[in-house]
Amino acid sequence: TGFILLYFSTKNLNFLSKILILLGTSVLVISFIVVGHSFSSGIYSQLLVIVHVICISYWVGSFLPLRHMCTINNCKNLHEVAHNFGVYAVIYISLLVITGLIFSYILLGGVSPLITSYYGNVLLIKISLVSIILAIGAINKFKIVPNIKVNQIDGKNKLKSSIEIEIILTFFVLLLTSILTTSLTTPLGV
């Protein structure tokens, strides 16, 4: 339902479209808390998941537009857009990591189940992949994006390649997330 509302809302960007985008986004976010472990873990966990999903949406949702900007010849504002993205990303990626760690701790009931349970092992792989994506993002922010100002062609090609790697790794993170959410029981039996 959420995707359908989002699809129709992009036809015209008037007031109704903005309402449909908000409604569609809300339906998508709520769907994450009514299916999976957060539903059984209480309202605090559900709020963590809502913040987590919103932050993921901002982060991952930027990949394709930024990648597209890298394919445009003589894209004059790529440096500015990528730089501003990096500034805001610090905020929502921090929230993403904090909410993810707290929610993981709630689901695991401690740190040791990361090593001693199958659920924890899969979660540890997911955390490792996210750490790699964060490292790539840091390289983008501090090395590649500043290079765009000096050498736009080289900088935008490197940023495009870097974003493509992030997209591939994100696919695997989302795959692991779906396995953790729907197929595995937490060490606490949730």
Predicted regions and their residues:
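Polytopic transmembrane helical bundles with strong interfacial aromatic enrichment
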Residues: T1-V190
